[in-house]
Design a protein with these regions (language model features):
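Conserved anion/nucleotide-ligand pocket segment
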Residues: 1-8
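Short alpha-helical functional segments enriched in proximate histidine and acidic residues
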Residues: 2, 34, 138-142
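Short, structured coil segments at secondary-structure junctions
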Residues: 3, 21, 110-112
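Rossmann-like adenosine-cofactor binding region
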Residues: 12-107
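C-terminal helix-to-coil terminal segments
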Residues: 98-153
Length: 153
């Protein structure tokens, strides 16, 4: 519960065991309507591509902040730019865009109240070493019949 926020979460597969007194499951329409900040943390699937589009933005509070450190195509960039310019969306921050590296004609460039950074968390030597260590640990565990970091969709 960061900064005293009430946390709403949505997933296409509801997992009640992840709900706590500080985090409650909400359907997307409720999440859009109730949130001051929307932060995307999900893989990209055909079903959620463009989930933040004009229609979704219209359901959001005026001045909402949108964060995307997941996948660029989750957001329709033209619709977000329009909402930023009009003030419907108060601000956005992201380290992913629909086409990387970002092109000069990306509609988000030059938009109001947006922070764009490169998606390079993996770049430092320490991060790459950690990735290799995790890969080795995963392989060893798999070979021992005890897989870790299993993701079930």
């Amino acid at each position: 519960q960061a900064f005293g926020m009430r946390v709403l979460a949505y997933s296409r597969t509801r997992r009640p065991e992840l709900e706590t007194e500080n985090c409650r499951y909400a359907e997307l329409d409720e999440l859009y309507a109730a949130s001051d900040v929307i932060s995307l943390h999900c893989p990209l699937f055909p079903e959620n591509e463009g989930m933040i589009d004009r229609e979704a933005i219209e359901k959001m509070k005026d001045g909402v902040l949108i964060l995307n450190t997941a996948r660029g195509p989750l957001i329709v960039e033209e619709d977000l730019r329009e909402a930023l310019d009009s003030g419907k969306v108060g601000g956005a921050a992201m380290d992913v865009v629909s086409r990387e590296p970002i092109s000069r004609d990306n509609p988000l460039l030059g938009g109001r109240n947006i922070i764009l950074t490169p998606h390079i968390a993996w770049a430092p030597k320490e991060s790459r070493q950690r990735l290799m260590d995790i890969a080795v640990d995963n392989l060893k565990a798999f070979m021992e019949g005890k897989p870790i970091h299993v993701v079930n969709f």
